Curated annotation (Swiss-Prot):
Gene Ontology CC terms: cytoplasm
EC annotation from Swiss-Prot or TrEMBL: 1.1.1.27
Family in the record: Belongs to the LDH/MDH superfamily. LDH family.
GO molecular function terms attached to this record: L-lactate dehydrogenase activity
GO biological process: lactate metabolic process
Functional description taken from the UniProt entry: Interconverts simultaneously and stereospecifically pyruvate and lactate with concomitant interconversion of NADH and NAD(+).
Major location (coarse): cytoplasm
Compartment(s) where it occurs, according to its Swiss-Prot or TrEMBL record: Cytoplasm
Protein name listed in UniProt: L-lactate dehydrogenase A chain
Keywords: Cytoplasm, NAD, Oxidoreductase
InterPro entries named in the record: L-lactate/malate_DH (IPR001557), L-lactate_DH (IPR011304), L-lactate_DH_AS (IPR018177), Lactate/malate_DH_C (IPR022383), Lactate/malate_DH_N (IPR001236), Lactate_DH/Glyco_Ohase_4_C (IPR015955), NAD(P)-bd_dom_sf (IPR036291)
Active-site residues, Swiss-Prot/TrEMBL: 192 (proton acceptor)
Gene: ldha
CDD domains noted in UniProt: LDH_1
Length: 331
């Protein structure tokens, strides 16, 4: 008799039980690992699968996390074979090519499209009912690509979008007012990154509109220069990259925030990237961030934001830029 047999006597033969809340992270780079640890520490799933083409890095990261199993409640698995991801509820895609020095954005996009042509069909094969969350950049275009390649309905393909931009925005407003970010209600919509749109008309604390107190807020004529905050939001990522080489923690926490709303069916409103054709005067098939309701079925509803004419115009301009890039892609 083995030690195990001497120690344990079976009462019944256990049937294999599938995971009830499995999450997969594709890509074990800085963003993938920050997302993984954020999901683990928030205890959002009973199984976390990780997949990447870089076998040694993947194996090392999985082992490192598994060594902390005592401190977690989640089963952690990893393999370069996508079968390890089977029956995931949410699949987070962080994999993608990095921008080379002097490389055009369009060229980077096409390289990432080619990577997605391998990743997305594999996800669909093993988790045909999952909710796809795209984090790889440029996120709005790649969410469109994932939607096209997956054949999924639009409510099951979500881009992490401006969830992080809005978090940065609220943090900086909080710094200026000496308040916690959760008490500063503010939204950034549109394209994630350089041409994002801050909705100054909606910024409020305890229901008090800041633009009501300072009608010039967010404009060039504002003596308090609130507009600089949005510039800080846009420059924030570049600043972090300059200082530490990449961004990871905040985007990882942002991903876990979105995963939580889906897994726990919270019906919470987040600014995430979705198909905005027909909204705010957008005519083309593009994905941009608007406030959306996230729950167990994915993206269930879109909130109709009241935007000023100037804000709407910025949104349409972003849409045109994205469509210009998308129509050149070979899918």
């Amino acid at each position: 008799m083995s030690t195990k047999e001497k120690l344990i006597s079976h009462v019944m033969k256990e049937e294999p039980v599938g995971s009830r809340s499995k999450v997969t992270v594709v890509g074990v780079g800085m963003v993938g690992m920050a997302s993984a640890i954020s999901i683990l520490l928030k205890d959002l799933c009973d199984e976390l699968a990780m997949v990447d083409v870089m076998e040694d890095k993947l194996k090392g990261e999985v082992m490192d996390l598994q060594h902390g199993s005592l401190f977690l409640k989640t089963k952690i698995v990893g393999d370069k074979d996508y079968s390890v991801t089977a029956n995931s509820k949410v699949v987070v895609v962080t994999a993608g090519a990095r921008q080379q020095e002097g490389e055009s954005r369009l060229n980077l996009v096409q390289r990432n499209v080619n990577i997605f042509k391998f990743i997305i069909p594999n996800i669909v094969k093993y988790s045909p009912n999952c909710i796809l969350m795209v984090v790889s950049n440029p996120v709005d275009i790649l969410t469109y690509v994932a939607w096209k390649l997956s054949g999924f309905p639009r409510h099951r393909v979500i881009g992490s979008g401006t969830n992080l931009d809005s978090a940065r925005f609220r943090h900086l407003i909080g710094e200026k007012l000496h308040l916690h970010p959760s008490s500063c209600h503010a939204w950034i919509v549109g394209e994630h990154g350089d041409s994002s749109v801050p909705v100054w008309s909606g910024v409020n604390v305890a229901g008090v509109s800041l633009q009501g107190l300072n009608p010039q807020m967010g404009t060039e004529d504002d003596g308090e220069n609130w507009k600089a905050i949005h510039k800080e939001v846009v420059d924030g990522a570049y600043e972090v990259i300059k200082l530490k080489g990449y961004t990871s923690w905040a985007i990882g926490m942002s991903v876990a925030d979105l995963v939580e709303s889906i897994i726990k069916n919270m019906h919470k409103v987040h600014p995430v990237s979705t198909l905005v054709q027909g909204m705010h005067g957008v005519k083309d098939e593009v994905f941009l961030s608007v406030p959306c309701v996230l729950g167990n079925s994915g993206l269930t509803d879109v909130i109709h934001m009241t935007l000023k004419a100037e804000e709407e115009k910025q949104l349409q301009k972003s849409a045109e830029t994205l469509w210009g890039v998308q129509k050149e892609l070979t899918l």
